[in-house]
Structures are given as C-alpha cells and as structure tokens.
C-alpha cells in the first residue's frame, strides 16, 4: 500500500471512531437536554460524517 493510501485508511479509522462516539452521544441523556438548535447541529454533523465515511470507504475500495 502506498503512503497516501495508508493515510486514507488511517483517516477512515479515526473518523469511524469519532462517528461511533458521536452516535452513542446522540442516544444519551445529555444530548436530549441540549437546546434544539444544538441537537440539530449535532445531528447534521453525524450525517455529514457518515457521508464522509462512505466516500473514504469508496476510495479505499478503489485501491
């Protein structure tokens, strides 16, 4: 694997870890206590992170 390809794999691993933590947070009581505007931002963030993760998976699949 080329160095630039390994960086993409590493990036995907890091992103997946962060996304997993965010999704767990979204199911928690702290999230439920946040103002609706902040809940909306966090929900949008998780959706964008999921799309980003999909793009990285596609890139890795093309190696």
Model region roles, listed by residue range:
Residues 1-63:
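Extended, charge-rich alpha-helical interface modules
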């Amino acid at each position: 694997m080329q160095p630039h390809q390994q960086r993409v794999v590493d990036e995907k691993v890091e992103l997946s870890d962060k996304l997993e933590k965010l999704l767990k947070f979204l199911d928690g009581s702290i999230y439920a206590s946040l103002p609706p505007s902040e809940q909306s931002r966090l929900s949008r963030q998780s959706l964008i992170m999921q799309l980003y993760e999909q793009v990285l998976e596609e890139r890795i699949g093309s190696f």
